[in-house]
């Protein structure tokens, strides 16, 4: 049943990256105790305290999974040897899954989920100052970099907006 456990673990790795906006270096430091609390306090790049919130639905589903696997403490994400997963391990496995499912491995990497988090957040709740705080950015200008649109997104928006 190791195969199923590892697949579920990767399901949650992707969900955490997408739903928390965590950097991969932050993700690997999340412990089961943080999931139980609903957040993880960490110091961002600039040495500033940042709280990484774990959304309610993700927290509930994670706790169910942890109950099934009978895990109650320690790092949330482990490698096949039971040690804390590494950032490199996550990057490599995401690349493997991208290849397996026919996705472009150049766009499936840990930090791409952080960009997606930023875009999704602003689409649902248009407050860039709050988003900057949640992402641990000192400046809104840093956050704006995450929100740049691709050429195809720009084209689609122009086509939708400019109808004259």
Regions found by a protein language model. Give the residues of each.
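Short, leucine-enriched amphipathic alpha-helices that occur as contiguous helical runs
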Residues: 10-11, 87, 91, 114-115
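Conserved tyrosine-mediated DNA breakage-rejoining catalytic core shared by Y-recombinases
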Residues: 20, 25, 29-64
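Short coil/turn motifs that cap or connect alpha-helices
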Residues: 23, 104, 138-141
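Active-site/catalytic core of tyrosine-dependent DNA strand-transfer enzymes
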Residues: 55-105
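Catalytic-site neighborhood detector that most strongly recognizes the C-terminal catalytic loop/helix
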Residues: 46, 135, 140-160
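Basic, Lys/Arg- and aromatic-enriched nucleic-acid-binding interface segment
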Residues: 4-24, 69
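C-terminal catalytic core of tyrosine-transesterase DNA break-rejoin enzymes
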Residues: 15, 19, 114-138, 145
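Phosphate-coordinating loops and pocket residues in cytosolic domains that bind phosphorylated ligands
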Residues: 29, 37, 145-148, 163
């Amino acid at each position: 049943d190791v195969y199923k456990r590892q697949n579920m673990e990767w399901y949650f790795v992707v969900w955490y990256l997408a739903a928390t906006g965590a950097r991969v270096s932050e993700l690997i430091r999340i412990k089961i105790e943080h999931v139980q609390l609903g957040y993880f306090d960490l110091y961002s790049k600039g040495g500033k305290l940042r709280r990484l919130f774990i959304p309610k639905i993700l927290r509930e589903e994670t706790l169910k999974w942890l109950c099934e696997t009978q895990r109650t403490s320690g790092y949330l994400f482990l490698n096949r040897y039971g040690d804390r997963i590494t950032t490199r391990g996550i990057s490599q496995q995401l690349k493997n899954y991208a290849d397996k499912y026919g996705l472009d491995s150049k766009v499936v990497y840990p930090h791409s989920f952080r960009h997606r988090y930023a875009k999704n957040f602003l689409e649902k709740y248009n407050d860039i100052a709050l988003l900057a705080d949640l992402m641990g950015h000192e400046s809104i200008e840093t956050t704006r970099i995450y929100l740049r649109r691709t050429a195809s997104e720009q084209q689609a928006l122009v086509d939708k907006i400019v109808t004259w």
